[in-house]
């Protein structure tokens, strides 16, 4: 067959090349590109890394690209490219905040004839081999991305080309339309007629070029309250959303930065790429930490060393004065950690942004103040060189609603507004001082992320000392005490200064080791830093282990305190009880609608929610570390049976009708919502229409505990751990203790009785949900079904009162519904609670 194809192929090739030659002969000779200088002589020129030319007559922005990356003038140098959002949407749910930045990408320009392409090479897959063939294999095995294509409009004798980049700069590089669609707000598309280059944000400098565009996104369909609620919350015309997007081209940092290997014990974010030429037996994945560049002026210095270029951060001038001061002070704490790592005072600096500086200039490390419609997270991010992990720009986003939520929490705890007493000044306002404590800590926390640090959610398990911070990289719950006369004290809610763990982490990431006058890596010295820390009892556990509801680690939690989560839960419940006894009109200011008492009540009524979550994780818990072979750390250990039972006893107190029933003296103060102040998702649930619902509130609080306690993963572990050691509590032990603690079969009267029955109903629903959960093991489901059968027999007995009879009838009906067809049973959803996280902030 191959032989018979040869004449045919020869004919095809001959015809093909003949056709190509004929086409070439008939084509017009290509005209040389116009002179760049001539083409731009009437335009406004912005010299810089990539020069810009603005044509005011046509509204077009031209980009000059020097093709100096090769001798043929077909390739540019490599640049770092990033995008950001100088004007955001102010919606926490959509997540497009003012000042938001992307990650940095490596890019370059390539010319082919009249085309210029902007290309992002694939930096995720690399080789350290110097062999051209090995490098070609990697390059050809994975795709690159062409980000944009341009037509060459003119060129200069030195190889620079001019392109019309207007369409590119007016494109949706920040993926705003994608974010809108992803949050269910509908389809939006850029309307070119209502979009333009924003000249006030477009600048060029020797080491970076900045271009900003004002973009209008037009709705492509209906934008009703039901279909686009978040857009309607924040936009004058929800069919037309106008924001600004910003693009930055940066010169790559010079040589001299030494990447530092990532360790799971050190508390950093990793940057990772694959090296396909490492020896067999070694990991393909090459992991390094992200960090700023710090180099000693004197390589021989070992203490209080002066940096060639200190790390400089700037705080947004738009924050209110008191907040600005707190932001600056908190971020400056990091200098303490750098001094521990061998650097001189002032190596880490924080100042107010100069009045004439542009916060979107990628050269500035920024702490920005951001407004949103509802509460949401603050966060720290960074633009880093993907080749090395070197941080080029740190960017902190701090939500302005943080302080207002913290102030609300302090008001609920302290009930500060005594009738006839004037409001205190700032220095004597306990709530305000608590807010400023928190803002300082928050500024330090988010700045820590921009230094490369991850969360350490186990820091709060270190012995508590009000005068000592363990880590600002934890999520702190306010440490509130109660005086001898029953008054909550918020004066020491948050400690001052950088933490013990934070100093360890900075020591690992930023201490410079030198040999022969040059920075080097010293693996034994880095390992010693971590070993010395581990000997003190410090633990590092981060998000993956702390956030899941089914998490097993007994020390890694969000918004908790104390070495013993169960003991601390008992203490927090006592603080809550003391504050509830004092709660009344004196928690709101004179002239405030009384219905706002309900808003102030929410964070106090649910004050225990996160400490309860911490205590729950001891049940079916496993204590472990991020072990590396040879590091000497402990091996995993199941939480001791006594500790699990202590935790269970404390957790079950959160289901107590006595804890969840509000007194009549308080209920009598709560009117229906005032016109203009409707309930929101921040309100406690109500099944009673306009009036406050104390039973619905209790159901909601109970479900917070029950969802955690009867999580399928936790239940499965209880089964496993009891099988491995019969001294460990079994799943049945936990179920029976829960039923006994709440008095499931007791018939009580009054509001306490209704709350008791409501909680009992939620317990049943939690058990039914676990029995029907496909992720629960067969043993877990079987254990729960045996319990349900036993409950059915007990519920069939007559009650002493009508309320009890009605409750039992409903419970029996639900159990019968389940057993009729377990595969088709639909568990009731948990009663929604107001969002809690973050403490004193958004989302």
Regions found by a protein language model. Give the residues of each.
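Bacterial N-terminal signal peptides
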Residues: 8-19
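Boundary at the C-terminal end of the N-terminal hydrophobic targeting segment
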Residues: 21-23
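Auxiliary tRNA-acceptor-end handling modules of aminoacyl-tRNA synthetases
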Residues: 25-319, 337, 344, 352-405, ...
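Sec-exported extracytoplasmic/periplasmic mature domains
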Residues: 332-343, 448-449, 453, 478, ...
């Amino acid at each position: 067959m191959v032989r018979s194809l040869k004449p045919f192929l020869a004919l095809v090739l001959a015809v093909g090349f003949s056709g190509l030659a004929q086409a070439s002969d008939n084509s017009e000779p290509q005209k040389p590109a116009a002179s760049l200088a001539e083409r731009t002589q009437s335009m406004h020129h912005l010299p810089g890394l990539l020069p810009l030319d603005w044509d005011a007559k046509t509204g077009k922005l031209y980009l000059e690209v020097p093709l100096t990356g090769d001798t043929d003038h077909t390739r540019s140098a490599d640049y770092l490219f990033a995008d950001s959002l100088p004007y955001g949407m102010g919606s926490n749910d959509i997540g497009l905040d003012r000042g938001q930045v992307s990650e940095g990408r490596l890019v370059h320009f390539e010319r082919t004839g009249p085309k210029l392409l902007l290309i992002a090479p694939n930096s995720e897959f690399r080789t350290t081999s110097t062999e051209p063939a090995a490098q070609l294999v990697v390059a050809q095995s994975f795709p690159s991305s062409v980000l944009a294509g341009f037509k060459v409009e003119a060129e200069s004798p030195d190889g620079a080309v001019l392109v019309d980049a207007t369409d590119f700069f007016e494109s949706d590089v920040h993926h705003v339309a994608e974010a809108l669609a992803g949050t269910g707000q509908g389809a939006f598309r850029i309307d070119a007629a209502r979009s333009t280059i924003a000249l006030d944000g477009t600048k060029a400098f020797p080491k970076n070029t900045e271009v900003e565009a004002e973009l209008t996104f037009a709705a492509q369909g209906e934008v009703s309250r039901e279909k686009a609620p978040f857009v309607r919350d924040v936009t004058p015309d929800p069919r037309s959303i106008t924001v600004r997007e910003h693009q930055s081209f940066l010169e790559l940092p010079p040589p001299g930065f030494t990447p530092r290997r990532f360790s799971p014990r050190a508390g950093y974010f990793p940057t990772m790429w694959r090296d396909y030429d490492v020896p067999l037996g070694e990991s393909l994945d090459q992991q390094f930490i992200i960090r700023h560049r710090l180099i000693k002026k004197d390589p021989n210095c070992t203490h209080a060393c002066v940096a060639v270029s200190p790390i400089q951060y700037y705080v947004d001038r738009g924050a209110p004065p008191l907040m600005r001061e707190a932001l600056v002070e908190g971020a400056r704490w990091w200098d303490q950690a750098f001094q521990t790592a061998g650097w001189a005072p002032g190596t880490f600096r924080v100042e107010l942004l100069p009045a004439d500086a542009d916060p979107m200039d990628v050269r500035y490390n920024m702490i920005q103040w951001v407004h949103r419609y509802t509460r949401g997270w603050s966060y720290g991010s960074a633009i880093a060189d993907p080749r090395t992990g070197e941080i080029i720009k740190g960017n902190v986003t701090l939500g302005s609603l943080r302080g207002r939520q913290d102030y609300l929490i302090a008001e609920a705890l302290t009930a500060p507004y005594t009738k006839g007493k004037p409001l205190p000044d700032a220095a004597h306002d306990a709530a305000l001082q608590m807010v400023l404590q928190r803002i300082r800590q928050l500024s330090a926390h988010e700045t820590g992320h921009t230094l490369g640090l991850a969360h350490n959610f186990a820091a709060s398990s270190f012995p508590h000392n009000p005068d000592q911070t363990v880590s600002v990289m934890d999520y702190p719950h306010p440490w509130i005490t109660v005086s001898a006369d029953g008054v909550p004290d918020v004066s020491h809610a948050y400690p001052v200064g950088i933490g013990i763990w934070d100093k360890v982490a900075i020591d690992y990431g930023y201490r410079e080791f030198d040999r022969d006058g040059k920075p080097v890596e010293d693996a034994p010295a880095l390992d010693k830093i971590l070993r010395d820390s581990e000997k003190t009892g410090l633990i590092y556990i981060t998000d993956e282990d702390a956030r899941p509801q089914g998490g097993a680690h007994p020390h890694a939690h969000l918004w908790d305190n104390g070495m013993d989560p169960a003991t601390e839960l008992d203490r927090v419940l006592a603080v809550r009880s003391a504050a509830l006894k004092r709660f009344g009109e004196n928690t709101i200011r004179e002239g405030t609608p009384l219905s706002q008492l309900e808003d102030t009540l929410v964070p106090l009524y649910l004050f225990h929610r996160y400490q309860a979550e911490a205590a729950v994780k001891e049940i079916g818990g496993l204590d472990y570390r991020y072990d590396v072979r040879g590091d000497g750390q402990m091996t995993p250990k199941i939480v001791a049976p006594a500790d699990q039972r202590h935790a269970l006893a404390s957790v079950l107190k959160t289901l107590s009708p006595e804890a969840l029933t509000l007194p009549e003296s308080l209920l009598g103060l709560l009117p229906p919502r005032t016109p203009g102040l409707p309930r929101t998702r921040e309100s406690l649930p109500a099944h009673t229409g306009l009036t406050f619902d104390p039973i619905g509130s209790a159901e909601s609080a109970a479900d917070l505990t029950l969802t955690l306690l009867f999580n399928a993963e936790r239940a499965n572990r209880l089964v496993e751990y009891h099988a491995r050691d019969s001294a460990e509590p079994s799943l049945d032990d936990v179920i029976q203790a829960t039923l006994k603690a709440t008095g499931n079969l007791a018939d009580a009267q009054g509001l306490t009785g209704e709350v008791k029955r409501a909680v009992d109903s939620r317990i049943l629903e939690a058990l039914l949900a676990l029995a029907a959960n496909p992720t629960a093991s067969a043993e877990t489901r079987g254990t729960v079904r045996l319990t349900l059968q036993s409950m059915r027999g007990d519920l069939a007995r007559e009650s002493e009162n009508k309320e009890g009879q009605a409750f039992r009838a409903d419970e029996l009906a639900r159990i019968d519904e389940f057993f009729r067809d377990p595969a088709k049973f639909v568990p009731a959803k948990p009663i929604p609670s107001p969002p809690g996280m973050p403490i004193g902030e958004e989302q």
